[in-house]
A protein has these predicted regions:
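Phosphate-binding P-loop
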Residues: 27-35
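N-terminal pre-Walker A segment at the start of P-loop NTPase domains
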Residues: 2-26
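Conserved lysine of the Walker
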Residues: 49
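Short phosphate-coordinating micro-motif centered on Lys-Gly-acidic
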Residues: 2-7, 98, 104-163
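Short hydrophobic/aromatic beta-strand immediately N-terminal to the Walker A/P-loop
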Residues: 38-40
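Short beta-strand-centered segment that lines the nucleotide-binding/catalytic pocket of NTP-utilizing
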Residues: 62-78
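P-loop (Walker A) phosphate-binding loop of NTP-binding proteins
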Residues: 42-44
Length: 163
């Protein structure tokens, strides 16, 4: 397999952001890995990190609301094929707070960890498989995926094949 380390896509609106999340889930399902998968979601306030998370979580068969974990730090979704942990570390004042909540216990097998504002937990979080950078592009968004591990490269390679 050729190493593929970057991928970008123009996202027109909120619906397209959710569809892109579903596309990522389709690729993850094709890989059929039981490993923990970690995405760092990077972008300014309002760029669509939580919207992308909602698209991913709903594509994994969650039928309820997907809310931002800004005040709770983490929302857990125990779904049929995978557990998803959606973190929002924006309000984290000290990375050591993550130790008190048992952060290392979240990164176990067969889970997907979506982490907004990961830089606030630097040194205590699992390594990201994918860095997901969401950038304003006028009223739309540009998403850039950067592989940080072999698993991240596999995700991007599959994604590239499907588009």
């Amino acid at each position: 397999m050729t190493n593929v380390s970057c991928y970008s896509q123009y996202i027109l609106d909120e619906n397209a952001m959710c569809q892109f999340g579903a596309q990522l889930v389709s690729v993850i399902n094709e890989l059929n890995t039981q490993k923990a998968i970690t995405f760092y979601l990077n972008g300014d306030l309002g760029t669509g990190k939580t919207t992308l998370s909602r698209g991913i979580i709903q594509a994994l068969d969650h039928h309820g609301n997907v809310k931002s974990p800004t005040y709770t730090l983490v929302e857990e979704y125990h779904l049929p094929n995978k557990t998803v942990y959606h973190f929002d570390l924006y309000r984290l004042s000290d990375p050591e707070e993550l130790e008190f909540m048992g952060i290392r216990d979240y990164f176990n097998n067969n889970c997907l960890c979506l982490i907004e504002w990961a830089e606030k937990g630097q040194g205590l979080l699992a390594e990201a498989d994918l860095l997901v950078n969401i950038i304003y592009a006028d009223s739309a968004r540009n998403i850039e995926l950067i592989a940080n591990t072999t698993l991240g490269e596999q995700i991007i390679a599959k994604l590239t094949q499907t588009t």
